[in-house]
UniProtKB/Swiss-Prot annotation:
UniProt GO MF annotations: DNA binding; DNA-binding transcription factor activity; sequence-specific DNA binding
Region (Disordered): 1-29, 123-339, 511-604
Name of the molecule in the record: G-box-binding factor
Role, per record: cAMP-responsive transcriptional activator regulating late gene expression. Essential component of the developmental switch between early and late development. Binds to a number of CA/GT-rich gene regulatory elements.
Keyword Transcription regulation: yes
Gene Ontology process terms (BP): adenylate cyclase-activating G protein-coupled cAMP receptor signaling pathway; autophagic cell death; positive regulation of aggregation involved in sorocarp development; regulation of transcription by RNA polymerase II; response to catechin; sorocarp development
Subcellular location: Nucleus
Coarse class of the protein's main subcellular location: nucleus
Organism listed in the record: Dictyostelium discoideum
Length: 708
């Protein structure tokens, strides 16, 4: 605002009004910066002509001219110019105006700069003048300025037009002169080129005559077959020479088309002519060199032919036959006959070398004519493992065939290794099942449902067919061996030798063929430490936990219809004391007893829910719940009924342990730490046993250590 008012004072601007309150608003924001800000020309010169300023209207505010609001934000209306609203000082005489202390007033103290006071006085003098005189003066100045400016513009335009005409005339003369010079030079060049062409044609005719004479002499002495490659070579040379001549004529035509295009500068025209002449001379030299090279090649060929005719040898005959075959191949390639792949019978993608083509599908090169069919059928690769038992022997036979030959198998090795591993483990499991059945049949009678599961190896209780899901889960469960620490199978391949256990969160190496070190036969001395539990254990303290016998039918169904992972796997992690670490945990010893028994981790676990129960139970009193250790007495079936009664009595104490229906419950980290401490302290074991042969309800009895 400071600089605009300064310019308006010098150029007698029209931003003025009669109200004295606008002097306050007209000088707002003037003391913000000591130097005037440079404003663009929109605010200074263009507003001084006839029109009032657009961005800076007559300075008035909503409050009747007080300087609370900036003046350029308000429209120049008649309501604002007349004193409709009372002033700030009239409305609020006691409240000081906070904005006015930074602005200049007529009654200002003299400590402000003298320049601002002079500017303020000039603005007052301009505003006191009537606005009509300012408009008349501006209009008169514009009328005086307009004719002078108009005359100057006309003179400049006329001068520029004359200069342009002279330059255009000079350019036209120069272009005509250049075209004449170019035409003359091209005529000379064409004359020289015609002479050179005549000489070349004469040399070619002489050369052809010599070749014809040599051919006639050669045909008399040799057979007609030996002359065929020579004629083809001549024909190719003639075609190449004609092709070179055609290219040279096309270049000449392009050179002749050049002078029709207008050129602006003489120097560029001369340079272009010189370049064209140089190019033409280079082309002529190249043609001469080509002719000389053709002559040399023809002479050497003729010499070879004459020497071959004098002394024919079997080596030259073989070479000639090779040339004939290469020419036939060239004809095939020029005729664009693409052969088909000998492996996949699809069109070849490109030529690999002189004889072989490349197939994109096989990613190999092949020679058309030599068949190399793939030895392994692709159906075995692409087909998923749906019929598990049928595909495995096919793949095994195909791998043996491939290993007997030198060619590597196209099937990936990882799948074959996994399938071999699965086959070996299945055979090992079947052998162990048969050995175990032989042992148990001699000692005791096996329950019918257990015998059915052992014979089937799969849950086939409802006489249903073996589905695809069971086969897939069987293959996945067999591929991962059990962990030797926690005996869980939820693991994956960690590296070449080790597997990773989810439960232990540690990698482990499978011992032997998937057997853990705890599967060694246990000694009868350690078994004798744990005596069978009788009904006298009901007098234990009330702090011992017990299991509520609920969900009986659900437990039976879930134990029957478990996934094959749980049935083929050994029981999950069971915490044991050091004295009972070697005690077998096989579910087959639930209802009967064998004196010399080596447990098998790969047998189907009937008590999978009981094992998960043993995982989930950890009481606070330092009592451990171990796995499925067998009762020692021969009258175990009689004791089982008493166990159910004692379980019902213990359940009346209100201590509820985990539900039997959760097969996937796990220990927390804190409970694992406590159980590790309790192992070192030697806690009391809890024997979990089934009440009935149908595994309807189970209960764990925790006796006191002093009672037995």
């Amino acid at each position: 605002m400071l600089s605009t008012h300064h310019h308006q004072g010098n150029s007698s601007s029209s931003s003025s009004s009669s109200s004295p309150s606008q002097t306050i608003g007209g000088s707002d924001l003037s003391n913000i910066s000591a130097l005037p800000l440079p404003l663009p020309s929109i605010f200074t010169t263009a507003q001084n002509q006839m029109n009032p300023p657009i961005l800076f209207p007559p300075t008035s505010s909503l409050l009747g001219g007080s300087s609370n609001t900036p003046s350029f934000l308000l429209p120049p209306s008649s309501i604002m110019s007349s004193n409709v609203f009372p002033s700030h000082d009239g409305q609020y005489p006691d409240m000081p105006n906070m904005v006015d202390q930074y602005q200049i007033h007529p009654n200002q103290n003299p400590h402000y700069n003298y320049q601002y006071q002079l500017m303020f006085m000039q603005q007052q003098a301009q505003q006191n003048q009537p606005p009509q005189q300012n408009q008349q003066q501006q209009h008169h100045q514009q009328q005086q300025q307009q004719p002078q400016h108009h005359q100057q513009m006309q003179q400049q335009q006329h001068h520029q037009q004359m200069q342009q005409q002279q330059q255009h005339h000079q350019q036209m003369q120069q272009q005509q002169h250049h075209q004449q010079m170019q035409h003359h030079q091209l005529q000379q060049h064409q004359h020289q080129h015609q002479q050179q062409q005549q000489q070349q044609q004469h040399q070619q005719q002489h050369h052809q005559q010599q070749q014809q004479q040599q051919q006639q002499h050669h045909q008399q002495q040799q057979h007609h077959q030996h002359s065929q490659p020579q004629q083809q070579h001549q024909h190719n040379q003639q075609q190449q020479h004609q092709h070179n001549q055609q290219q040279h004529q096309q270049q000449q035509n392009q050179i002749q088309m050049v002078p029709q295009q207008p050129q602006s500068l003489s120097n560029s025209g001369n340079n272009n002519n010189n370049n064209n002449n140089n190019n033409n001379s280079n082309n002529n030299n190249n043609n001469n060199n080509n002719n000389n090279s053709h002559q040399l090649n023809n002479l050497t060929l003729s010499q070879n032919n004459t020497s071959g005719s004098n002394t024919p040898s079997p080596s030259t005959k073989g070479k000639r036959k090779h040339h004939e075959t290469s020419n036939s191949e060239k004809k095939d390639s020029s005729g664009q006959t693409i052969p088909k792949c000998t492996r996949c019978n699809e069109a070849a993608s490109w030529k690999h070398d002189k004889r072989r083509w490349w197939c994109k599908e096989c990613k190999k090169a092949f020679t058309p004519g030599i068949t190399k069919m793939q030895q392994v059928p692709q159906q075995a690769q692409l087909q998923p493992l749906q019929n598990h038992n049928q595909i495995i022997p096919q793949l095994w036979d195909s791998q043996q065939n491939n290993s007997s030959q030198n060619t590597p198998p196209t099937q990936p090795q990882n799948n074959m290794n996994q399938i071999n591993h699965q086959l070996l483990q299945q055979q090992h499991q079947q052998a162990q099942l048969q050995a175990h059945l032989n042992l148990t049949a001699s000692n005791q009678q096996v329950p019918p449902q257990l015998q059915q599961q052992i014979n089937g190896g799969l849950p086939n209780n409802n006489n249903s067919l073996i589905t695809q899901n069971t086969l897939n889960s069987l293959s996945t469960s067999v591929s991962c061996p059990p962990c030797p620490l926690c005996r869980g199978i939820s693991s994956w391949k960690h590296d070449k030798k080790r597997y990773f256990c989810k439960e232990c969160k540690k990698p482990f190496t499978p011992v032997g063929a998937g057997l853990s070190p705890s599967s060694s036969p246990s000694s009868p001395k350690k078994k004798s430490n744990i005596t069978p539990i009788t009904t006298s254990s009901t007098s234990s303290s009330s702090s011992t936990p017990s299991i509520i016998n609920n969900n009986n039918n659900n437990n039976a169904n879930s134990s029957k219809n478990n996934t094959p992972k749980k049935q083929l796997s050994p029981p999950p992690s069971v915490l044991q004391s050091p004295s009972s670490s070697s005690i077998s945990q096989s579910p087959l010893q639930l209802n009967y007893q064998t004196p010399t028994y080596s447990p098998n981790p790969s047998l189907p676990s009937i008590g999978g829910n009981l094992n998960s129960l043993a995982n989930s139970i950890k009481p606070d009193g330092g009592i451990l719940i171990s796995g499925l250790s067998p009762p020692k007495s021969s009258s175990s079936l009689n004791n089982l009924n008493s166990f159910s009664n004692t379980g019902a009595l213990l359940s009346s104490n209100g201590i509820n342990l985990a539900n039997l229906g959760n097969p996937l419950s796990q220990l927390n980290k804190k409970q694992k730490k406590r159980s590790d401490k309790d192992i070192n302290d030697g806690g009391v074991q809890v024997l979990v046993s089934c009440v009935d042969t149908n595994v309807n309800n189970c209960s764990s009895i925790i006796p006191d250590g002093d009672s037995w």
